[in-house]
A protein has these predicted regions:
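Bacterial Sec-dependent N-terminal signal peptides
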Residues: 1-23
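Carbohydrate-interacting regions of secretory-pathway proteins
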Residues: 20-237
Length: 237
């Protein structure tokens, strides 16, 4: 019996809108080189920065893979992988799919559940036992075979946003995407305009947008209070 794994292909378009004048000036930059994770930092809750417990993040067949095959039990070992550079105005595109079955000991809500953390906290400032980075999460979900389960939703670990002119303090809000069952690849793009507009796009369709990402609220454990200063706008990560 396999455990769920997540396959990722990542690339990023550096918009730098303040400096560029024409869309034709934009060029895709491939973040993941298809060979190794030398440009990335791993942070797993309960472990020091850089310790890739259980070889969670790995490269197989030219793809970035998140696997729990070496876990006896998942527990609360929430893991994140951070690129070496920060960006402020950009489009990030990812193609993902889920394969296998849920890791033993994993929470029910975490089944076929991953995400892209936008404007994420510098992992150097995360505590050893912090579960999630302070960030804006573009939640990536896979269907469960029945019922609705959209993807590219918004979740807010230690953050809030403004939606339809009002401060949103709920932890997660669904996008308008359809449900993607099975193990087919899904393409997600996120347009990020500094601390103003963020837009979620799935297979070419805009499914959610909001403004003014900022630190606030809960839904993140063991964060350093010197870092989690509520009300501060998030402009890069």
């Amino acid at each position: 019996m396999k455990k769920y794994s997540l396959l990722f292909i990542l690339m990023i378009l550096i918009l730098d809108i303040s400096a560029q004048e024409k869309p034709s000036d934009f060029n895709w930059v491939q973040l993941f080189n298809g060979k190794d994770l030398n440009d990335w930092k791993v942070k797993i809750a309960g472990y020091p920065l850089g310790e890739n417990y259980g070889n969670t993040f790995r490269v197989e067949d030219g793809k970035m893979k998140v696997s729990y095959a070496e876990y006896d039990s998942f527990g609360v070992k929430y893991g994140h992988i951070f690129y070496k550079e920060k960006y402020a105005w950009y489009i990030i595109a990812a193609e993902y799919r889920f394969t296998g079955e849920q890791a033993k000991g994993g929470q029910g809500w975490a089944t076929r559940n991953s995400g892209i953390m936008i404007h994420g906290q510098d992992p150097v400032t995360m505590t050893k036992d912090q579960d999630f980075p302070i960030s804006i999460e573009v939640q990536l979900l896979g269907g469960l075979g029945s019922g609705l389960r959209p993807t590219a939703n918004l979740c807010t670990p230690g953050t809030n946003v403004v939606l339809n002119g009002k401060l949103l303090t709920a932890h997660c809000i669904n996008s308008s995407s359809k449900t993607y069952n099975g193990d087919n690849w899904v393409r997600v793009e996120v347009m990020v305009f500094g601390d103003s507009l963020i837009r979620h796009i799935v297979n070419g369709d805009t499914v959610l947008e909001y403004t003014k990402p900022q630190i606030g609220g809960g839904n993140v454990l063991n964060a350093d209070p010197a870092i989690k200063i509520d009300g501060n706008l998030l402009s890069e990560g």
